[in-house]
């Protein structure tokens, strides 16, 4: 007897452009103890239990997300190993609406294949992802939020003229002995630069954030408390891909996103959704409900939300960030035609190896990332990306275009009502 033996693909590899979302759902279920007391029991329930899982994915949004990341750099011609990913969540619920990246789902055997990977670039390592990617200036809204919480206004004047702070300068840090932290990581003090030349001026806090000027950021930081920033970052779930806090008090570079590990797009989108929903954080979830083979509902997944910011503070951050994508902002070319109903922040790490645009409307919060997972800190500057070679790449370049493409298509299908104007106190000049 001659047998015609062939292998049959199974599982998430059959899910097409939803393959990585499928893998995320499986890993999410593997951590759900309602499916079994042990990982082995949960795995059996998932694979052999005949369960039907109803997810939160919006097929139209997923198609738009996949088109956006593939337009940045198609997998088939990705000779330079440039990665792109995008995740969108619904503020106020945590529903994951879309999740895409510019690779096919692979296995460890595909480690040298530029078109495939086993890693989901959108999620943390616990869900099949990575340790994250340095957030760059997308961390700055947390500093802004703490600035507003401390009673300072968005239009208050900031000294943005300094690129150096001596070791003798005591940063406010109430969780340290004596209430001060003295930076000794460099013998002469803490130094840094702005992404572009200039910007060493006095101006408003809003101006400094909208232009993404590091000199303004540290001018603001010198007036507030590092320990408060750290606590707020944890409260807002600013965690790296291993689940640890992104922010580190001794490492002043983490305040501009120079973190040890990085953040995932899903975590970043969920964090920015706090501003979109006027201060409410909702844990991201990919599932609506699970039904049994007979159609009986086994479990309905509920929103898990908590108020982590005062609504006026969140609205103040939105008031500032909407200026980023308005004329005069650092990503003004990346607006989506909703000048009072959309907001965003770009992020670029030191050598442009990781770039971001994260932004939102009331109805969607979307994180867009372009960088490199396999090549570490390899810069995108001067690298061929889908036929283009640019001398300088920042968050607005490719990640911003990705974000804009997706949001222009999908955001109008959700809530695009204008943001609430913050109080006079938030907009004050002192």
PLM regions and their residue ranges:
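Sec-exported extracytoplasmic/periplasmic mature domains
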Residues: 1-6, 26, 30-34, 66, ...
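Non-catalytic, structured segments within soluble enzyme domains
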Residues: 1-56, 239-240, 253-257
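Feature responds to low-complexity, polar/acidic, surface-exposed segments characteristic
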Residues: 2-15, 46, 76-80, 248, ...
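Surface-exposed intrinsically disordered loops and tails
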Residues: 5-16, 34-39, 43, 91, ...
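A penicillin-recognizing enzyme superfamily signal
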Residues: 55-77, 86-88, 98-102, 107-134, ...
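Loop/turn elements at helix/coil->beta-strand transitions in domains of secreted/extracellular proteins
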Residues: 82, 92-96, 152-154, 227-228, ...
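Conserved catalytic neighborhood of penicillin-recognizing serine enzymes
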Residues: 152-229, 251, 293-323
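Mid-domain, small-residue-enriched loop/turn segments at the edges of structured enzyme/sensor domains
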Residues: 174-182, 187-189, 225-270
